[in-house]
Amino acid sequence: MFSLNQRFQHVSSLALSCSFLVIALIAATSWLQLVKDNVFELESQLSHIRSATRFAKQKRYGGSAVNPTEVSKIRFNADFDFSRLFNWNTKQVFAYVTAEYEGDENPHTMNEITIWDKIIPSRDNATFTLSDIDAKYQLWDLESKITERPLTFKLHWNIQPWFGFLINGETTGSKTIELKKPVDKQKGK
């Protein structure tokens, strides 16, 4: 006969294997439901993107008194509906707006900066119409220049499921603008 220890190992092994199978089925069916709902083609509208750019001499922005860096504060309007991202396996959705641009030193390198983010805990809070909102985070680059190059603003999302892997994507609406160079007040004197 089998000992008590062997029986326990057999039962726990079977239970663990069945649990992993159920979790895999949950993750697969919730992902298939997202594909069926066409969530990877969600539309959003980013508009009225404005900036106030200044020179920063603080060390935290990579600048100094001799070599200041450009820092830009963004204001924008956004309109999006993430209710289709919620199904029975969605715990919450993380939405964020990024600014994407090419680097000066290596023009084939794309830089991406997050300027705004929001955690959406339920389907009831998934529709937004933001007007004239300030970005949470300022734009600045290690190369000390963020202006006079095209920046493409996009709205991204990540789904945190109860079971399974994180699912991420971006909406189809994007907006490209070029920030204006700030006026250096010390050079004008």
Swiss-Prot record:
> Matching InterPro entries, A to Z?
SPC3 (IPR007653)
Membrane topology designation: Single-pass type II membrane protein
List the GO cellular component terms.
signal peptidase complex
- Which first-to-last residue range defines the signal peptide? none
GO biological process, any: protein targeting to ER
Q: Which UniProt keywords apply?
A: Endoplasmic reticulum, Glycoprotein, Membrane, Signal-anchor, Transmembrane, Transmembrane helix
Residues on the membrane's Cytoplasmic side span: 1-12
Q: Give the residue spans that cross the bilayer.
A: 13-35
The subunit structure is: Component of the signal peptidase complex (SPC) composed of a catalytic subunit SEC11 and three accessory subunits SPC1, SPC2 and SPC3. The complex induces a local thinning of the ER membrane which is used to measure the length of the signal peptide (SP) h-region of protein substrates. This ensures the selectivity of the complex towards h-regions shorter than 18-20 amino acids. SPC associates with the translocon complex.
Entry protein name: Signal peptidase complex subunit 3
